[in-house]
UniProtKB/Swiss-Prot annotation:
<feature type="active site">
    <location>
        <position position="58"/>
    </location>
</feature>
<dbReference type="GO" id="GO:0006633">
    <property type="term" value="P:fatty acid biosynthetic process"/>
</dbReference>
<comment type="function">
    <text>Involved in unsaturated fatty acids biosynthesis. Catalyzes the dehydration of short chain beta-hydroxyacyl-ACPs and long chain saturated and unsaturated beta-hydroxyacyl-ACPs.</text>
</comment>
<keyword id="KW-0456">Lyase</keyword>
<protein>
    <recommendedName>
        <fullName>3-hydroxyacyl-[acyl-carrier-protein] dehydratase FabZ</fullName>
        <ecNumber>4.2.1.59</ecNumber>
    </recommendedName>
</protein>
<dbReference type="Pfam" id="PF07977">
    <property type="entry name" value="FabA"/>
</dbReference>
<comment type="similarity">
    <text>Belongs to the thioester dehydratase family. FabZ subfamily.</text>
</comment>
<dbReference type="GO" id="GO:0005737">
    <property type="term" value="C:cytoplasm"/>
</dbReference>
<dbReference type="InterPro" id="IPR029069">
    <property type="entry name" value="HotDog_dom_sf"/>
</dbReference>
<dbReference type="GO" id="GO:0016020">
    <property type="term" value="C:membrane"/>
</dbReference>
<dbReference type="InterPro" id="IPR013114">
    <property type="entry name" value="FabA_FabZ"/>
</dbReference>
<keyword id="KW-0443">Lipid metabolism</keyword>
<keyword id="KW-0444">Lipid biosynthesis</keyword>
<dbReference type="GO" id="GO:0019171">
    <property type="term" value="F:(3R)-hydroxyacyl-[acyl-carrier-protein] dehydratase activity"/>
</dbReference>
<dbReference type="InterPro" id="IPR010084">
    <property type="entry name" value="FabZ"/>
</dbReference>
<keyword id="KW-0963">Cytoplasm</keyword>
<keyword id="KW-0441">Lipid A biosynthesis</keyword>
């Protein structure tokens, strides 16, 4: 990613997200990033649909988005901030910690989840974020997460 692209990107469609993150279907949990504020915050979007594979077993007849996938959506939104800031290209952003996770309301097919991610601090390759997942303006989940940029082994490329 060029220096101009790193500084000018204020939103990202799915194509741009796939340049920032290594995740792919069915594990890419962010469909769009509607706002990236420098390296400080971002808002990612996940449109939850009934045909996603997790709903086959969670739960038949009463589908609910697994909380761990909401956390993953938060982490991927945070990862996009890290990748954009550092222009890491082929390197990876590893999810390191989850603290203070809370699940407030169920998320179901048809919901549009907004992942609000705010950087709390950064030291070297270590980043800390506070994250909220919202549906229709109401917090459905929240967590504090940690991430680390890991330089990819060129032999594994």
């Amino acid at each position: 990613m060029t220096e101009d692209a790193k500084t000018s990107l204020s939103s990202a469609d799915i194509i741009e997200i796939m340049k920032l993150l290594p995740h792919r279907y069915p594990f890419l949990m962010v469909d769009r990033i509607i706002e990236i504020d420098s390296d400080n915050s971002a808002i990612g979007i996940k449109n939850v649909t009934a045909n996603e594979p997790q709903f086959t077993g969670h739960f038949p007849g009463s589908p609910i988005m697994p909380g761990v996938l909401l956390i993953e959506g938060m982490a991927q939104t945070a990862g996009a901030i890290c990748a954009r800031k550092d222009g890491i290209g082929g390197n990876l952003v590893y999810f390191m910690t989850i603290d203070n996770a809370r699940f407030r309301k169920p998320v179901v097919p048809g919901d549009r989840v907004e992942f609000h991610v705010v950087k709390q601090k950064q030291r070297g390759t270590i980043w800390k974020f506070h994250c909220d997942a919202k549906v229709d303006g109401s917090v459905v989940a929240e967590a504090d997460i940690g991430a680390m940029i890991v330089r990819k082994d060129p032999d594994q490329a």
